[in-house]
Design a protein with these regions (language model features):
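Class I SAM-dependent methyltransferase SAM/SAH-binding core
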Residues: 88-91, 96-142
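Class I SAM-dependent methyltransferase Rossmann-like catalytic core
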Residues: 43, 48-72, 76
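A short acidic, Gly/Pro-enriched loop at the edge of an enzyme's catalytic core
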Residues: 141-152
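Short catalytic micro-motifs in class I SAM-dependent methyltransferases
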Residues: 152, 156-160
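A short glycine-rich, Lys/Arg-flanked "PGG" loop and its adjoining helix->strand segment in the class I
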Residues: 162-168
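Glycine-rich helix-loop-beta junction characteristic of Rossmann-like nucleotide cofactor-binding loops
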Residues: 75-84, 106, 144
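N-terminal auxiliary segments of SAM/dcSAM-dependent transferases
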Residues: 1-46
């Protein structure tokens, strides 16, 4: 359900790449994520959280202090996606994947879960830890996801761009 950041066409996943019908191609990193942040959306050399920030957040979240919040998010997601046979769920601003991973586990194998974040370090960490989820580096200001492609979009502590969230 990812889209090409150049032309906006739907990307098809191959063995090691995503590509669109117009021939734009994006390699999968060895960790399993794809970089879909258009150069004009970066606004800095390395946007988003750096490696130390990602490590600190992961260590904090793994203490369990936000587990009740995550469980409530999962409960609401399960309730909302119940009518869908194979729900498509997008975590907009997924960070290092804590909520995304727990959400995918709660929803089970019938759900297709995607996550994106502007931080390459965060997405790399997420993709390394949560292998069954499709992760991408991308921006909330130009979400690399198909129009009306998600049955549920979650956004936990990330920038909210109402028009983009409504689009996906």
């Amino acid at each position: 359900m990812f889209i090409c950041p150049v032309c906006g066409d739907l990307l098809q996943r191959g063995e090691r790449t995503y590509s669109c019908p117009k021939g734009h191609s994006y390699d999968l990193a060895k960790e399993g994520y794809v970089y879909l942040l258009a150069p004009n959306k970066k606004h800095s050399k390395d946007p988003g959280d750096n490696k130390q920030m990602v490590s600190a957040r992961r260590a904090f979240l793994e203490t369990g202090l936000y587990q009740p919040f995550s469980e409530e998010l999962n409960r609401l997601a399960l309730q909302y996606t119940e009518p869908f046979e194979s729900p498509v769920v997008l975590d907009a601003g997924c960070g290092e994947g804590y909520y995304t991973g727990r959400l995918a586990e709660a929803l089970g194998e019938h759900a297709r879960v995607f996550g994106f974040d502007i931080s390459k370090c965060a997405v790399r960490a997420a993709a390394k830890k949560y292998r069954g989820i499709a992760f991408a580096v991308g921006s909330s200001f130009g979400i690399p996801f198909a129009e009306a492609g998600a049955d549920l979009v979650v956004n936990v502590f990330a920038p909210i761009v109402p028009g983009e969230l409504a689009r996906v």
